[in-house]
Amino acid sequence: FNLYPFQEKVLKLFQKHDYSIINKSRQLGISTLVSAYSLWLMLFNKDKNVLVIATKQDTAKNMVTKVRFAYQNLPTWLKIGTSEDNRLSLRLANGSQIKAVSAAGDAGRSEALSLLVFDEAAFIDNIEEIWLSAQSTLSTGGNAIILSTPNGVGNWFHKMWVDGESGTNGFNTIKLHWTVHPERNQEWRDEQTRILGVKGAAQECDCDFIGSGDNVIDPQLLMWYKETYIMDPVEKRGFDGNLWIWEHPNYN
């Protein structure tokens, strides 16, 4: 399929960085892009193992369905045949495969992974446990892509995003606000507020962690305080980087 410029940029970032975390607006085609990237990885490399984890099995299955659809629509000379094809997995003749599982039990415990995908990560309750379990499966050089719309602050997705922005966890952060889509305008955004409400539109369109959560205080007021009073430290010290300095002392 033909890519928009922002999708081309995201694809290049996938290739450049081992770990990517995406805070995205809805309906930007990013799940489809990840599916196409997964198929490329499987098709042109032997014995690659892609695992998709989502809140529900049906959600994870959608990505396998997209990979299957893309493969079926390839020109004949690009197809290499399949050795396994069902609703939750697709294995190519070269040994590469993609599987879909729900976020339950031993979801992250698998054979060595080439690519781990978390879909709608902000809504997976036990994702921290799954991520810890997956570390050993990624230790042989696997990559990870985490994508989601925001779901308030303080959850695992929000923490990973904040740490990624500060450069402390190895994740490259990719923010995809609704305005990156060339065919959307303010009229479209206003329509989303009418359909979804202020909170729903903040979550689904604006990549807004504060506005998407269950806040007692008006999210717009919280955002004003954040933009007005909160600033990044000028320096971080200590072996773990947890001594934050906003202003150096004046000894004069």
Ranges and model annotations:
Residues 1-252:
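Phosphate/NTP-binding elements of NTP-utilizing enzymes
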